[in-house]
């Protein structure tokens, strides 16, 4: 038993010994590997220290090589502009007529770019080259400017605008192909000018040339219309108020607006941005100055003939204001210039309203002699014609009356001053008030003049009635006047004059009617018949004393003389048809019932012999009816 166990331990011990031996071999191998790693690391460090400087030198060489390439490129770029000068100089100095325009513009563009490149280097050595390029570009620019002027002059022959307006033809423009050329030329001139001194002199020389040539063409084309506007304003005093549309300012303005529209279409294609507005303003500077001058001269004529020609001021305001808004909506320009040109005319128009009132009063007060037959005076027709004409200018009058304020036209001080602001002005009502004030000023002034110059009440009454009749007729014949004066207040105010005129005329018959008044004694028998009863003239006459009978006879005789005189005077006076009928009816309404009563009571005073009682009731009624 012991022997087998010993053998088993011996085998295990041998195996352990083998394991230990293998472990020792592994340790030796590990040490060898560690030694190899140390040697490898040492070798790597040696290689690293050897290769590092080589790599660094390689990077430096690469950077140097890149810098050399860039220097070469810069040198090449510097040489290119110099080469461009030699290449383009011949084309540019020969002028655009020697080559195709596109080729010439391309050469200018290349020189322009070369100059930009040279200027960007900031090298002193390039200053001479830059100067040479500037000179070359200036030469080319001058030739392009000459070409631009030459092309524009081909389309600058003055035209007669009236021909195109009357035939409803479009105003002449520049052909589209030419506009394309002008666009390229102007762009090249503008670009080239940006390098030279021209900018400091006031901007784009192409714009100046365009404005000079086209501006002269426009001013010259409009000159005849300006002259016509001034010639057509001169009229005879007998021609009456200015008639709408008879002055040439309407055609002049229409032509100017057409020119602006046509020119803006051209400018919008040639120029860009802000230059469009500047080009339009510069081009029309001379034409608008002439237009403003014409308006000022028209204004002076209007001021000298305010009663008849203030309507021209209203027409000018209407025309120019409407045109300025249309032009502004189309171009965005020139509106302020038109409003400024209109200012003197507008101020005259504002003051004209108070002047019309004052002038009406002055003219009425200065009438030296009135027609002896009670006829009206030309001033009435003149004023009513003016008022009828006035209603045709409700547009411009709306703004003028609103700015003045209600009633402020009654004094010249208010016309030029600041009126109280009406927050909701009714321009139609304001115009109605002004027209009513004019009519009242006319009739009141003539009434005062009539009472001063006519001694007879009959003539005074007829004169005032004739004045009222002409005023009333003018209102009825004009739908616009009738509309403005159709309110109850206006009708009542005007009718006041008719009542006063009628009352004045009836005053002349008052003495005649007083002869038909008698004294009745109710205590006497038969002196006063019962109401509605039959009057017994014989009984009444019998009851009279001799003295009373004589008094009645005298009354009949006085009445006959006075009545005959007034009838003859009535027939001799001049009356408008309506006036004659109205006054005859008024006289009849007063006199006929008085005479009928008096005749009924006292016609038996002369027993039918006609010695005292000249008219019976029928014949008197016929006489009165014949007055109409």
Curated annotation (Swiss-Prot):
The keyword Transport applies. It is found in: Bud; Bud neck. Pfam families: Exo70_C, Exo70_N. It comes from the Eukaryota. Involved in the secretory pathway as part of the exocyst complex which tethers secretory vesicles to the sites of exocytosis. Also plays a role in the assembly of the exocyst. One of its GO terms (biological process) is exocytosis. Belongs to the EXO70 family. This is Exocyst complex protein exo70. It comes from Aspergillus fumigatus (strain ATCC MYA-4609 / CBS 101355 / FGSC A1100 / Af293) (Neosartorya fumigata). Keywords: Exocytosis, Protein transport, Transport. Its main location: other. GO terms for cellular component: cellular bud neck; exocyst. PANTHER family: EXOCYST COMPLEX COMPONENT 7, EXOCYST COMPLEX PROTEIN EXO70. The keyword Protein transport applies. GO terms for molecular function: phosphatidylinositol-4,5-bisphosphate binding.
